Amino acid sequence: MAKISMINRDLKRKRLAKKFADKRLSLKKVISSDASSYEEKIEASCKLQKLPRDSSPTRLRNRCEISGRPRGVYCKFGLGRNKLREAAMRGDVPGLRKASW
């Protein structure tokens, strides 16, 4: 089980990334646009730098929804490998079964 503070920190980052996503996208469009002047690009990059650091989606970490484990997380299910295995063995995940060859 991950520390509660780490889980809460990641949740805070998700909220901030969602809150500033539109603003961040519009500033990045101005920076990468050929139609923008040099001054507009500089101004947009300054505004982008002044956004909260945790609002960047790069700082997000995929965590298991149940245990908060940061590694070995399957994006499709949102669960860590251990919890996914437990859920599959209980039959909670439809269509998922143990591999056999």
Swiss-Prot record:
A cellular-component GO term for this protein: small ribosomal subunit
A Pfam cross-reference name: Ribosomal_S14
Keyword Transport (UniProt): no
GO molecular function, one term: structural constituent of ribosome
InterPro entries for this protein: Ribosomal_uS14 (IPR001209), Ribosomal_uS14_bac/plastid (IPR023036)
Subunit relationships: Part of the 30S ribosomal subunit. Contacts proteins S3 and S10.
Family statement: Belongs to the universal ribosomal protein uS14 family.
Protein name as catalogued: Small ribosomal subunit protein uS14
Lineage: Bacteria, Pseudomonadati, Pseudomonadota, Gammaproteobacteria, Lysobacterales
